[in-house]
Amino acid sequence: MATPPKRSCPSFSASSEGTRIKKISIEGNIAAGKSTFVNILKQLCEDWEVVPEPVARWCNVQSTQDEFEELTMSQKNGGNVLQMMYEKPERWSFTFQTYACLSRIRAQLASLNGKLKDAEKPVLFFERSVYSDRYIFASNLYESECMNETEWTIYQDWHDWMNNQFGQSLELDGIIYLQATPETCLHRIYLRGRNEEQGIPLEYLEKLHYKHESWLLHRTLKTNFDYLQEVPILTLDVNEDFKDKYESLVEKVKEFLSTL
């Protein structure tokens, strides 16, 4: 993928809160293209920053290449909880979903004190949100009987408490939904070759796709967060490979941001 030069950001409408950081979540199915897309956005504008999914934490990768991926005791001493979840979901789904959400909250909170503090028109793109953690992935695992009733009740209670403590800082100004068919996502899973994902069946992706569509396209999925019903959503069709043909998608993002 060609590296686009960084340049000045588009002119946005002045916010009544001055330089308050606009927070946008990039949502979509597994392998829809979120990582590729946020990396494109990060390179386009000095006032744009991204918070990638902390996959390294989940896979126990000993890497300090990313500012959001510094090692923790749980990462140094733990196993590959992503792989454990895929291999034995009935045993590890609750553990994985709890840790995935915890590591996401930690990374996203840390980013708020980063370089965007001094930006003129700061925009922070999250690769997924605490809401998809619960209402897409954890919910699907519960409905698939990979979490029992007690685990699901504890998870929801824990998620509510964590959001009561930290959620206001992470409330979204907008959502960008990268829409791709389950078949496209399955093909991209194969192409990117992440070992933990190679056994994912099409049926699993179809269930996640249905939940994404209900939440972000039809807006029929109910949550405990009333404000989400009013959050603007931009849907982008990413069934075609966009790594080297992203200009039209970026223009839609700029137009979307100008309305927030």
Curated annotation (Swiss-Prot):
Keyword Membrane included in the entry's annotation: no
Cellular compartment(s): Nucleus
One GO CC annotation: cytosol
Binding site for ATP: 28-36, 188-192, 240-242
One family name in Pfam for this protein: dNK
Residues modified as Phosphothreonine: T72
Residues binding substrate: E53, Y86, Q97, R128, D133, E197
Name of protein: Deoxycytidine kinase
Species of the source: Homo sapiens
Gene behind this protein: DCK
